[in-house]
């Protein structure tokens, strides 16, 4: 069970990394398809960066009250709706909302998975798995960037690249489904006071 949660966490972080890398790769296509200015493309990108810290802060504050399971359920909802909305957005406003949702899902992933791994293991094992978990952010960016380049060179549309992000999303949802999540080792009151 613990290893399944760990692997699910890794795929959730790969989803975060893919969204970061693939969005960077498809920005020129979005600009062409929707006649968007550089300023508008920058604002779309900033929504990813806005949703990420907001949900990470709120998820961290409420981790002990609602637990990692609910936070990751919300992450899955945000990732899935954000990806689908981006694909069918039809324009600037839809892309703004979609990117914000994806950013929120990414922040929820960080808020839930880091403490969940820390609560599941102790000592050297925890250190090892935390390092392996965090390896998947730069690793996922490399994989996502190469995938985006490959799809672009094949002249596949940006929509295909957005659908590609759904693959690790579905995998982490499957790995988390039906699993018992660990209880926090310290009380929520102590965590909030320290924060």
Spans of features found by a protein language model:
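Extracytoplasmic
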Residues: 4-38, 114
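MFS 12-TM fold signature
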Residues: 52, 78-83, 102, 168-172
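Conserved MFS/SLC helix-loop-helix module at the cytosolic interface between two early adjacent transmembrane helices
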Residues: 54-93
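Cytoplasmic helix-loop-helix junction between adjacent transmembrane helices
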Residues: 98-135
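Flexible cytoplasmic inter-helical loops of multi-pass small-molecule transporters
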Residues: 177-195
């Amino acid at each position: 069970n613990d290893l399944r949660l760990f692997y699910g966490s890794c795929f959730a972080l790969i989803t975060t990394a893919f969204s970061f890398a693939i969005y960077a790769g498809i920005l020129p296509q979005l600009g062409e398809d929707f006649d968007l200015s550089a300023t508008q493309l920058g604002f779309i990108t900033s929504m990813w960066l806005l949703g990420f810290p907001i949900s990470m802060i709120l998820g961290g504050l409420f981790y002990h009250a609602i637990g990692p399971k609910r936070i990751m359920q919300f992450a899955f909802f945000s990732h899935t709706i954000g990806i689908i909305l981006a694909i069918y957005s039809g324009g600037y406003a839809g892309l703004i909302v979609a990117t914000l949702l994806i950013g929120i899902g990414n922040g929820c992933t960080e808020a839930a998975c880091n403490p969940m791994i820390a609560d599941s293991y102790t000592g050297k094992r925890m250190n090892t798995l935390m390092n392996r978990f965090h390896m998947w952010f730069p690793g996922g960016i490399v994989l996502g960037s190469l995938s985006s380049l490959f799809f672009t060179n094949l002249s596949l549309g940006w929509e295909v690249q957005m659908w590609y992000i759904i693959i690790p999303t579905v995998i982490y949802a499957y790995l988390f489904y039906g699993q018992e999540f660990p209880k926090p080792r310290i009380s929520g009151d102590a965590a909030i006071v320290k924060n």
